[in-house]
């Protein structure tokens, strides 16, 4: 069984949450996969989930593929000592919208313990320019076919 987890700040109404839930609900119907979501802040979801959703405090017991969705959740995953293959899916460049410490963001992005997945080719170029690290791949809107090629190869 392939275990896959998403780590988010919140599952509240957003494009990111909508596509994540849509794709994880599809995975749940396949016996090959065991999707789970870890969140920092509990909130109402935009769509009903058909998979487990837990507080981030349970993450230390997870052993599978982890896909984080923000600089802060990526930092949490990096600092957690568990048997998980870790990825950061950069849906947007949050440091461009909100002031963030360059050293903090760069230390997370350039960490060898986490691979970066971008949402588009233009995001890939921006990430490489920002932290001098190649992305592991490009995934549009949580597309599981694209994601599988990156995380399980």
Predicted regions and their residues:
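N-terminal pre-catalytic "stem/leader" segment of glycosyltransferase-like enzymes
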Residues: 1-62, 142-153
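Histidine-centered beta-alpha loop that forms part of the nucleotide-sugar donor binding/catalytic region
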Residues: 9, 90-94, 140-141
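A short acidic, amphipathic alpha-helical/loop segment
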Residues: 19, 23, 76-81, 101-105, ...
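Hydrophobic anchor at the start of a short beta-strand
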Residues: 31-36, 84-86, 133-137
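Short internal beta-strands
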Residues: 35-40, 89-90, 117-119
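Extended catalytic core of nucleotide-activated donor transferases of GT-like folds
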Residues: 43-110
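A short, active-site helix/loop in glycosyltransferases that binds the activated sugar's phosphate group
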Residues: 76-77, 113-135
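C-terminal functional extensions of proteins
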Residues: 127, 141-142
